[in-house]
From Swiss-Prot:
Taxonomic lineage from the root: Bacteria, Pseudomonadati, Pseudomonadota, Betaproteobacteria, Burkholderiales
Family statement: Belongs to the RuvB family.
UniProt-listed InterPro entries: AAA+_ATPase, AAA_lid_4, DNA_helicase_Holl-junc_RuvB, P-loop_NTPase, RuvB-like_N, RuvB_C, WH-like_DNA-bd_sf, WH_DNA-bd_sf
Subcellular location: Cytoplasm
Residues that coordinate or bind DNA: R300, R319, R324
Name of this chain's protein: Holliday junction branch migration complex subunit RuvB
Alphabetical keyword list: ATP-binding, Cytoplasm, DNA damage, DNA recombination, DNA repair, DNA-binding, Hydrolase, Nucleotide-binding
Organism: Burkholderia mallei (strain ATCC 23344)
The record's note on its domains: Has 3 domains, the large (RuvB-L) and small ATPase (RuvB-S) domains and the C-terminal head (RuvB-H) domain. The head domain binds DNA, while the ATPase domains jointly bind ATP, ADP or are empty depending on the state of the subunit in the translocation cycle. During a single DNA translocation step the structure of each domain remains the same, but their relative positions change.
Gene Ontology molecular function: ATP binding; ATP hydrolysis activity; four-way junction DNA binding; four-way junction helicase activity
Protein's gene: ruvB
Cross-referenced HAMAP family: DNA_HJ_migration_RuvB
Binding site for Mg(2+): T75
Location of the region described as Small ATPAse domain (RuvB-S) in the Swiss-Prot/TrEMBL record: 191-261
PANTHER family, per database record: HOLLIDAY JUNCTION BRANCH MIGRATION COMPLEX SUBUNIT RUVB (PTHR42848:SF1), PTHR42848
Amino acid sequence: MIETDKLAAERIIAATPASSHEEAFERALRPRQLDEYVGQEKVRDQLEIFIEAAKRRSEALDHVLLFGPPGLGKTTLAHIIAREMGVNLRQTSGPVLERAGDLAALLTNLEANDVLFIDEIHRLSPVVEEILYPALEDYQIDIMIGEGPAARSVKLDLQPFTLVGATTRAGMLTNPLRDRFGIVARLEFYDAEQLSRIVRRSAALLNAQIDPAGALEIAKRSRGTPRIANRLLRRVRDYAEVKADGNITAAVADAALAMLDVDPVGFDLMDRKLLEAILHKFDGGPVGVDNLAAAIGEERDTIEDVLEPYLIQQGFLQRTPRGRVATLLTYRHFGLSAPDAANPVRNLWDTPDAEC
């Protein structure tokens, strides 16, 4: 899994941050207020109402759970919530909170109505999660003083606070934890027009010249994800400054992204390698994932966790009981004629393949 995570971070079209340097770059481009936040209109409108209501009552905002694919702005929203509420934000992540004392130290240092942001909240340990329940409901925590027979439990009162939890895997949250969030919001992938607005805004902050067509060209290849759009913008800006006059046009963006092996739908070399293997080595499928992994020289986990999700979400790949199958979109993308088998229909005699 470590190798899979490393590989995901190395891809230019990966939705996870590649380095601490990139995280610092993201912070510089991050919108600071809700009215600067592009996209996610439904979530933004809801938060605007809930935040204003909490401010009028001088209360802490209800606890917020943000979930959705990586790179869509969950961390950005957590910072915006704190800024709109006019309070401090403390940030941590699930894997960092190893012991109950780690969480207790954070909670006891919060001031009234502060925001505690826990990224990857689905990775909290059960021990830490147990401490969190009374803190969320009653603004109290139980801590143990002493050891052995002399140990005793002491209740500590906390200041009212808002927990903002972020996760890419909402299904891994326990029911008791999920039920304690009063505001639950799912972030969706962005369309090309929304991403184009984000690219133009980021270009202005970077003092980069870009025209609307150039911004749209980058947006269309960003896989619906602002983090990828901003990363591609940086690379296209470099290309424009060295190979062109510094102005990012559609032609300049196309040439730069072609150099980076990012095609018109946002596929990179690894995406195309997987799809071409299914088309040419396995006649469009079905093919079991272990055979596919051997054919392209990648690990099974890499295929399932890194490569497949976007291809399936975009309709280029199907998972069937018998294996992976290329769709009509895949044949069209590679300029091939699709056989009838490219639009499979399951019948009663289909049986699951053990390696699927």
